[in-house]
A protein has these predicted regions:
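Soluble non-transmembrane domains of integral membrane proteins
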Residues: 80-339
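Short non-domain terminal segments
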Residues: 54-57, 66, 129, 184, ...
Length: 551
């Protein structure tokens, strides 16, 4: 029994360590290239991205193909137009009519700098991260692509108080009579952005074309830091083909570009807690492509080709998502988009845990109290199992004097001692393995909750009480890990000590080991384990009293 219990405690630490290692391998960024004097990455084998490095996605010529062709725009930069909603602060450029800057209102980079917001889109060369959208035409016809110059009425647009929807319209016209309106639709509280084109063909010939979405981003690895979980998270492109979700490796894109046709799919760029996604209309096949040049990758979505006869009108619709990975909004935006919240191999447990946590948060208004209530619920679910285990442990605790007598009688005869102890357990109807079950059962729950707290943006910078002002980061003063270590020590005192002196010393050291280990875990996870220990102590103390009275 004692070997099994010791093994399971060590296994818990080992599994947690493996999870940490897997996280680093899965999400760890590639080492950054050497920097130049001005701090920008430099590699003679990697061409710099300049205005000439500009591509347009081609119309699909065969299933899964959307070739890239050189743009033929005027090369101007256009002017910037500001758009502000209750959740987004954006810049749009009239050249291409594209979104090139996005600051997330209410999401500061650090809690102590509320004025410094998380920025997802950025036109600066060192942090290039921009959308490029437009229409492609067949047969060399006029087209309002992302190099076209669009006209717009205002210099700034704001979602007013009491206004639920904001539309921003741009206009374009060709000399031969083709006109287009490009309309962005923003909704209060939403990071989903509608994009609609209204085409009027007053030319003498039919017009044929498709809408496209493109995202260009420079891969900028973060320097790893033990205190910065963002630096270990996966940053890069992902794709969903309507059935499965896949992370795209930058090196693979350099060697072989992605080309696929999917119905109900999407393509996106993610980082810890945030993403930008390009979503074609559902129900129709779209071309999804990805490629890279140097440290810049380009993702594209090309929708189905449509005909607009002479004298007729046509409409093209797409969707962009720019913001935090709020699961409710992700599910509403596109099927499978919630998979960008990566809970790893324990998703089947993590998703129900988050669902319960979310409901409890709705009741309490505080994620810390939601974690405490979740811990109580988990304890209630496994109460009978813990009770059976606790009774077995209490009976074994009462058998300690008799076990000590057996040790003195058999001395170094380990085989004889083992047989005598098994006979004693059998006679007293004690199951020595029962004490291991709660630890074994809690392992997957523990790891699943770890990923929930780490990956769920809902808990990013979420305060609890007193000194805990961010449940997704470590305790800044290490008070909670110390309290957790104390409760582990008390738990051990309530359970029977291992008969082997070496095992006893190892068990006594485990609270110290776990305290150090948990010091770098999210405070919310340590809170869960601390509360779980308190409940286990109360339950075991009650069981010990009952067993001692002969119950």
């Amino acid at each position: 029994m004692d070997n099994q219990r010791l093994f399971l405690w060590i296994a818990l630490a080992f599994v947690a360590f493996l999870s940490w290692q897997a996280w680093q391998i899965d999400y760890g960024p590639t080492p950054p290239p050497a920097a130049t004097a001005d701090g920008t990455p430099a590699d003679p084998a990697i061409p710099a991205v300049d205005s000439a490095d500009d591509e347009l996605p081609g119309l699909p010529s065969a299933p899964g193909e959307a070739a890239l062709t050189p743009a033929s725009g005027d090369g101007g930069d256009g002017r910037y137009v500001r758009i502000v909603t209750d959740v987004l602060d954006l810049d749009l450029t009239t050249r291409g009519g594209d979104l090139v800057r996005a600051d997330l209102i209410g999401y500061p980079v650090r809690k102590d700098r509320p004025d410094q917001l998380v920025r997802l889109l950025d036109p600066s060369p060192n942090n290039l991260y921009v959308f490029r959208t437009g229409l492609r035409a067949a047969g060399g016809a006029a087209e309002p692509n992302h190099q076209a110059e669009w006209a717009i009425a205002e210099q700034e647009y704001r979602l007013a108080d009491g206004q639920d929807t904001l539309e921003v319209a741009l206009e374009w016209a060709s000399p031969d009579g083709l006109t287009a309106r490009k309309i962005y639709t923003f909704r209060r509280g939403s990071y989903e952005i509608g994009l609609r084109y209204e085409i009027r063909n007053d030319t003498a010939a039919a017009w044929q074309g498709a809408s496209y979405l493109q995202l260009r981003r420079r891969h900028v690895p973060l320097d790893r830091s033990m205190t910065d979980v963002d630096s270990y998270s996966y940053r890069g492109p992902i794709v969903y083909n309507g059935d499965s979700y896949e992370k795209l490796d930058l090196d693979d894109l350099l060697e072989e570009p992605l080309r696929m046709t999917a119905t109900g799919g999407w393509i996106a760029s993610i980082q810890h807690h945030f993403l930008t996604a390009m979503i074609p209309p559902g129900g129709e096949a779209a071309s999804l492509t990805g490629g890279a040049r140097g440290d810049v990758y380009t993702l594209s979505v090309v929708g189905p080709v449509r005909d607009v006869p002479a004298g007729a009108t046509g409409t093209f619709e797409d969707t962009l998502f720019v913001g935090p990975k709020i699961q409710e909004q992700l599910r509403a935006a596109a099927p499978g988009l919630e998979l960008s919240v990566d809970y790893g191999f324990l998703t089947i447990i993590s998703q129900p845990l988050f669902w319960v946590l979310d409901k409890l948060h709705g009741l309490t208004g505080n994620w810390g109290w939601a974690i405490i209530l979740l811990t109580v619920l988990i304890k209630l679910v496994f109460y009978k199992l813990s009770e059976t285990s606790g009774k077995s442990m209490a009976k074994m605790r009462n058998l300690q004097p008799r076990i000590k007598q057996l040790q003195e009688r058999f001395g170094d005869d380990r085989q004889g001692l083992s047989q005598a102890m098994m006979q004693l357990y059998k006679r007293e109807k004690v199951n020595p393995a029962a004490g291991c079950l709660p630890i074994l059962v809690q392992m997957p729950v523990f790891l699943a909750l770890y990923w929930v707290l780490l990956e769920s943006v809902e808990m990013r910078q979420a305060p609890f009480a007193l000194w805990i002002n961010d449940l997704s980061s470590k305790d800044p003063y290490f008070i909670l890990p110390l309290l957790m270590g104390v409760t582990m020590f008390i738990q051990q005192k309530l359970n029977p000590a291992p008969p082997d002196p070496i095992q006893a010393k190892v068990m006594m050291a485990l609270p110290i080991v776990f305290t150090v280990f948990f010091a770098f875990f999210p405070a919310g996870l340590v809170l869960y384990w601390f509360v779980n220990n308190l409940l286990s102590i109360a339950q075991q103390w009650k069981i010990n009293r009952v067993v001692e009275r002969g119950g």
